[in-house]
Regions:
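Histidine-acidic metal/acid-base catalytic patches
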Residues: 2-32, 37, 41-58, 164-178, ...
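Active-site acidic/histidine proton-transfer and metal-coordination neighborhood
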Residues: 15, 20, 47-49, 84, ...
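Active-site-proximal loop/turn and secondary-structure-junction residues that shape catalytic pockets
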Residues: 39-41, 64-66, 98-101, 127, ...
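Conserved beta-strand positions in the central sheet of alpha/beta enzyme cores
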Residues: 61, 94, 122, 144, ...
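Glycine-rich, proline-tolerant flexible connector loops at the mouths of alpha/beta enzymes
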Residues: 62-80
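A short acidic, helix-capping loop that chelates divalent metal ions and anchors anionic groups
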Residues: 66-70, 151-154, 212-217
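Metal-dependent catalytic neighborhoods of phosphoester/phosphodiester hydrolases
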Residues: 71-75, 103-109, 254
Length: 268
């Protein structure tokens, strides 16, 4: 039996599918789900890229330990990573520095960000925030203050109010990289935190935590981070930044990350 689909119809249909596939997720009302690469800290870069590719991940935040400032990485590490990621069709949109403590750290962070081709830097700083604001405004980059939980320690950025107070005197260049898991660990409602930070939100770390005052990660939807409500709130905000799935665990995370990404995409 002859097919009723002509060549012209086939070409038009294929072109339409390709055009649709090329539209970023957030352009069609979908949240932009990617990965925070600290999740793969036990793997080599090459093995990590294999797993990212298998999951169909297109955007990441570079947060692997060897790239953080306190480990004194060299330029070649970033050049090589950029080459490998580009070859795999994976975009690095943010670089996690950890603490920027002085001018040299800031200069290194800017240089490394350029080598990776990112548009945002995530980290923490206190005295350096005005210099970060000025320097990154000049470079056309943004900075997201990262909230964190440390057991037995008081950290500068635990609550959304801590972050907002730090942002009060800074330009819109500086905002928040909101880690919903760390907010939950510190006893704060992640959804409320996202609402309060909405106008300054640069990036989201999507992780679920077993219990307040703890650091044990669980699969998304299994803990106290209110992940479905978090995603609803990001939809309400029409958030266009990266929603970076993070899962901190020793040992193999391949199956875990497959479940994590599938869960996040279902809510995206």
């Amino acid at each position: 039996m002859r097919s009723s689909i002509t060549r012209r119809t086939f070409v038009k249909t294929a072109a339409g599918i390709a055009a649709t596939a090329a539209i970023p997720l957030w352009a069609s009302g979908k949240l932009n789900v990617g990965i925070g690469t600290y999740s793969y800290h036990n793997l080599s870069m090459d093995d990590m890229i294999v797993q990212l590719t298998a999951l169909g991940i297109k955007e990441i935040e570079m947060s692997r330990g060897e790239f953080m400032l306190m480990h004194h990485p060299g330029d070649d590490l970033f050049r090589t990573a950029r080459t490998k990621l580009d070859r795999a069709g994976i975009g690095c949109v943010s670089y996690y520095t950890a603490t920027i403590k002085d001018v040299q750290d800031l200069e290194n962070a800017v240089r490394f960000a350029k080598l990776l081709g990112v548009r945002n830097i995530t980290g923490d700083a206190t005295d350096m925030l005005p210099q970060i604001d000025q320097r990154l405004s000049h470079e056309g980059l943004t900075f997201g203050i990262h909230n964190h939980y440390f057991k037995g320690e008081r950290f500068a950025y635990e609550s959304p109010e801590d972050v907002l107070n730090a942002l009060a005197s800074l330009s819109k260049t500086v905002g928040a990289t909101a880690d919903v898991g760390h907010f939950a660990s510190c006893g704060h409602d992640p959804v409320d935190a996202l609402r309060k930070l909405a106008s300054r939100l640069k990036l989201v770390h999507l992780k679920d935590i077993e219990a307040p005052g703890g650091e044990v990660n669980v699969l998304l939807g299994k803990g106290i981070s209110r992940i479905p409500e978090v995603m609803q709130e990001l939809h309400r905000q029409s958030f266009t930044g990266l929603v970076a799935v993070e899962y901190e665990k020793e040992g193999s995370v391949e199956d875990d990350m497959r479940q994590e990404v599938a869960f996040a995409r279902k809510l995206a």
